[in-house]
């Protein structure tokens, strides 16, 4: 089963990716690597799954050096065309949506960032799941979102 994990470089997302790979799933991780949280921590989590920082830029799928069943793409959820292409090309059976712009205080001064990521981005995930007949969608959030 091929599974998309959004927020794959985040704390929870990186653990979800590892557990799915350990149980034998094929996984595509997606994250925009924004700088709200420490970027080097995110790249460190990706490195634990075999994704090399220098290869993880741009909008191309990068193959893991540790797991043959893992690929990663740096992408914004709000890029509807890129999301549509990813879903069409990869034909995911399941999606675990963990990506979001976090932080309550930051949302007061930068509401547009939250609308684009947490509303528009999630809408794109939902539409891509619907149009590509994804069997299951798991949506999770934290108190920080």
Annotate the PLM regions:
Residues 1-145:
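N-terminal Rossmann-like NAD(P)+-binding domain of SDR-like oxidoreductases, especially those catalyzing
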